[in-house]
């Protein structure tokens, strides 16, 4: 996982009123059938070590459910993936900020978006990887079987995270994009 110069600063959205977004849960058995029947794109997006893999944290966890990431040490949760060389994500915190870094496979449109629900204290990272498969008419792809069209990882924000000053950057190479998100702490003197 490497960062390169020439990063694109992503807009962090705060007003997303998509009805029914992430309302269809991705169950363990559904995910296993989906992944076993899929091709290389599905495995690149949802495979071992990916930020969007339901098995990223050692056991199954639906990525559309908010996870309290910063309550855990990356070294502990990712130890087995790191020992196998399959880890493409990392997170940490300093006195000033919370930081998330992740490789994101370049598949399909790869339109990574970051949303923050300031009141609900949740950050979500999502994007559409399969624009060829049509969602139901008059429906947003995130409102149905979202995993057939895109990906998501929802994260609970710590109580001292100042989400309104968050920054996200994306840099690209041939096979992966590198995403870095920085969320300052409320009492930090250094807002980005």
Swiss-Prot record:
Pfam name, any one: HSP20
InterPro entries in alphabetical order: A-crystallin/Hsp20_dom, HSP20-like_chaperone
Compartment list: Cytoplasm
Entry keyword annotation includes Metal-binding: no
GO CC, one annotated term: cytoplasm
Residues covered by the sHSP domain: 80-192
Key word Cytoplasm present: yes
Protein keywords: Cytoplasm, Stress response
Entry's family note: Belongs to the small heat shock protein (HSP20) family.
Subunit comment: May form oligomeric structures.
Protein name, per record: 21.7 kDa class VI heat shock protein
Organism the protein comes from: Arabidopsis thaliana (Mouse-ear cress)
Lineage: Eukaryota, Viridiplantae, Streptophyta, Embryophyta, Tracheophyta
Gene: HSP21.7
């Amino acid at each position: 996982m490497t960062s390169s110069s020439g990063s694109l600063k992503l807009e962090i959205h705060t007003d997303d009123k998509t009805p029914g977004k992430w309302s269809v849960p991705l169950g363990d058995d559904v995910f296993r059938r989906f992944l076993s029947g899929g091709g290389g794109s599905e495995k690149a997006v949802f495979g071992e070590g990916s930020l969007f893999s339901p098995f990223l944290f050692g056991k199954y966890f639906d990525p559309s459910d908010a996870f309290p990431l910063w309550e855990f040490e990356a070294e502990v949760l990712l130890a087995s993936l790191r020992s196998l060389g399959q880890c493409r994500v990392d997170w940490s915190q300093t006195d000033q900020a919370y930081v998330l870094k992740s490789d994101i496979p370049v598949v399909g449109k790869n339109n990574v978006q970051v949303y923050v629900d300031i009141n609900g204290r949740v950050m979500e990272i999502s994007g559409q990887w399969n624009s060829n498969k049509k969602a139901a008419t008059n429906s947003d792809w995130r409102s149905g079987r979202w995993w057939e069209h895109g990906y998501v990882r929802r994260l609970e924000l710590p109580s001292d995270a100042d989400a309104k000053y968050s920054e996200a950057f994306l840099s690209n190479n041939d096979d992966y994009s590198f995403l870095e998100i920085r969320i300052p702490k409320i009492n930090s003197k250094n807002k980005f």
